[in-house]
Curated annotation (Swiss-Prot):
One of its GO terms (cellular component) is cytosolic large ribosomal subunit. Pfam families: Ribosomal_L11, Ribosomal_L11_N. GO terms for biological process: translation. InterPro entries: Ribosomal_uL11 (IPR000911), Ribosomal_uL11_bac-typ (IPR006519), Ribosomal_uL11_C (IPR020783), Ribosomal_uL11_C_sf (IPR036769), Ribosomal_uL11_N (IPR020784), Ribosomal_uL11_N_sf (IPR036796). It comes from Protochlamydia amoebophila (strain UWE25). GO terms for molecular function: large ribosomal subunit rRNA binding; structural constituent of ribosome. Forms part of the ribosomal stalk which helps the ribosome interact with GTP-bound translation factors. Part of the ribosomal stalk of the 50S ribosomal subunit. Interacts with L10 and the large rRNA to form the base of the stalk. L10 forms an elongated spine to which L12 dimers bind in a sequential fashion forming a multimeric L10(L12)X complex. This is Large ribosomal subunit protein uL11. NCBIfam families: L11_bact. It comes from the Bacteria.
Amino acid sequence: MSKKVVKVIKLQIPAGKANPAPPIGPALGAAGVNIMAFCKEFNAKTQAMAGDVLPTLITVYHDKSFSFITKKPPVAELLKKAKGIAKGSGVPNRDKVAKITRSEARKIAEEKIQDMNAADLEMATNIVLGTARSMGIDLIKE
């Protein structure tokens, strides 16, 4: 028999750096989960990915136990890492912060496609390019 799910919590947590401070502590505390047990388990599982922000789905069960699934970093984080920028543009239609080619966007889409709502690689590439555009990263011809 499966456990009864009480709550599903979505958080973005830096890999290997979970701690009881907000936003993790209040979200898990409200659900009655042992916060330190989650932090230790999460940090142990994500130690190798240090530096990345990971979207995490935490499933809380009726007996206050939990399980979690980590996904690939958000497309915006992957773009910032690939282009070596700290953040996107504040005014993306006027100030461009970097340039990207379609093949670079395709590489990011290949890495992220399992977490995306896209039917194929071409659609995933277009999603990555849309995110890049909204961050002030310009598409250039190859």
